[in-house]
Amino acid sequence: MLDESLIDAAVSRILALKFRLGLFEDPRLPDQERIDAVIGSDEHQRLNLELTRESVALLKNNGSLPFAADDAKRIAVVGPLADDAQTQLGDWAGNSGQVNWMPDGHPRHMITTVLDAFKQLVPAGCNVVYSRGANIVDLVPDPEGEFYPDGQPRPKIGVSAAVDQAMIDEAIENARQSDLVVAVVGDVVQLIGEGCSTGTLELLGGQNALLEALSNVARETGKPLVVVLMSSKPMVLPASVIGTNGVIVDESAAEGTSALLWAPSPGMKGGQAIAEIILGITEPSGRLPITFPRHAGQLPVYYNQIRGQHGNRYADLTQDPAFAFGEGLGYTTFEYGEPAITNVPDSGAFTESDTVHAEITLTNTGERKGIEVVQAYIGDIVTSYSWTDRELKSFKRVELEPGESKTVAFDIPVADCTIVDPDANRIVEPGEFELLVGHSSRREDLKRTVFTVA
């Protein structure tokens, strides 16, 4: 048993701190007037829209995007997350999947879902229809009991929902009658919030069945199917989106999916940013800060693994991820020149106190203005201790008009080109380093040059 004096001493320290902060005179209770004026204000919404426009990543496009809606008569917006305001915000944002005592959530009128946005942005005369298509989770009582030991009620937990064929049939009917199908799928807060981990990375509930059915319709009709993935973690997508896995991937199963966008917790105006990108109002420029595996068995699959951690493939599966760190497409094409280091010392070698200045020419070879995120990676070619093959050191966002070229420059301190020794010290080892510049972390997307450190 604790002595009561110990509790008194602890309480005394807390009260003394509150006194020093002036909380007894001014408890600083929430200012409702300020809350109403600031939270979800026009400036907040403008900033959220700007950030989301730049963060949504276009991962696949067979040429169907941007979609020209001027001649479209009907667009089908499908999926359990197409009109889900809470999933756009994420966990602990106005509400939570972890407790049942939160308020009613973020005011709905402040949130623009994907369905809302298409209704607002399509031309007059184009009808937007919605079908849910699938459920993700069913909420059931916690098997641990209705209450926590302290008497607080336990929230219900989410379990994977069963496939609902009637919902899929409704979505198929809408898809057949539409010029464009936008399917919004992913995770809900019960699966990604605090204290929540799933035993699989696959889409749960009836989502895979829905995507397969929509993909079949798209192949039969030739109408574009755009999949929007809302998730805050990498997910394993079905064959209808990324093809059939194997040592050699069979892409034929994914021919029905025209395009794929990833939107991680896009926020209040997320639906507007997504619709703008699909309709070509906004140029996609987001790049992946994570890597998407093809199968959970590939993990770990992040780009900067220690050399020798994996072979080049499994016996039954490629080691290449579905989508790699740094990947993301736009609506134009770019051509990279060869990287050049322009400040090599007369000795031919840099010292640890030097900075490497590198330049590369980037050209917009397409017909639209576009944004490219030029990425610079460093690799220490021979190391005394096992270390990663390459690491991102810098990146630049470059906007170019059609036919325009620009020299993109990077200044990388040699002191940043470190490895970690067995004593956990970061050190720069003398020797040859490679500078890799390009579109993503994939080797085939990078241009290479080398420099020496003495």
What does each model-identified segment do?
Residues 1-115, 119-159, 230-371, 377-379, ...:
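Secreted, periplasmic, or luminal enzymes acting at the cell surface/secretory milieu
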Residues 178:
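An anion/phosphate-binding loop that grips the pyrophosphate of nucleotide cofactors and donors
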Residues 369-376, 388, 420-422:
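Short, hydrophobic/aromatic beta-strand segments
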Residues 384-420:
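Intrinsically disordered, low-complexity Pro/Gly/Ser/Thr-rich segments with frequent PxxP/GP/PP motifs
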Residues 416-432:
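Short glycine/proline/serine/threonine-rich loop/turn segments at secondary-structure transition edges
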